[in-house]
Regions:
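C-terminal capping alpha-helices of c-type cytochrome domains
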Residues: 64-67, 82-117
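Second-shell loop/turn segments in exported
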Residues: 3-6, 49-52, 95-99
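Electrostatic cytochrome c docking/interface patches
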Residues: 1-23
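An acidic site on a long C-lobe helix of protein kinase domains
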Residues: 12, 58, 101-105
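Gly/Gly-Pro-rich "capping" loops immediately C-terminal to redox-active cysteine motifs
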Residues: 19, 33-67, 78-92
Length: 117
């Protein structure tokens, strides 16, 4: 579990909410429903609803799931590691060695998810 923040700057929940909804960044809504974003279209059903996620997972768990979901769930999870260099199959060569999100974006998402109680 990753207890310590990835950056020295505290996460910003408002920025995390934007990343969560942004189809070109976190794109969390593609797989997860979230009642806090009822105004957004097309909530996914692949992953669990994130309503009340802060009541189910501690901060360190949320950070670990975002960094590399396979460290918490099984290797078969379809959730990508957003701050991991571990890649799956059929990844474009120009993307190897790059993370999906930056460390501060992970911290912003953690701050936002911690508000979903």
């Amino acid at each position: 579990m990753i207890e310590k923040p990835l950056t020295d700057t505290p996460g910003d929940a408002a920025s995390g909410k934007k990343i969560f909804a942004n189809r070109k960044q976190g794109n969390c809504l593609a797989c997860h429903a979230n009642s806090d974003m009822a105004d957004q279209l097309f909530h996914g059903e692949v992953g669990p609803s994130l309503d009340g996620v802060a009541s189910r997972w501690k901060e360190g768990h949320l950070r670990t799931i975002l960094v590399n979901a396979k460290a918490v769930f099984s290797k078969e999870t379809v959730m990508p590691g957003f701050y991991s260099l571990e890649v799956g199959e059929n990844v474009r060569k120009d993307l190897i060695g790059k993370t999906i999100l930056e460390a501060q974006q992970i911290e912003d998402l953690v701050a936002y998810l911690q508000q979903l109680k």
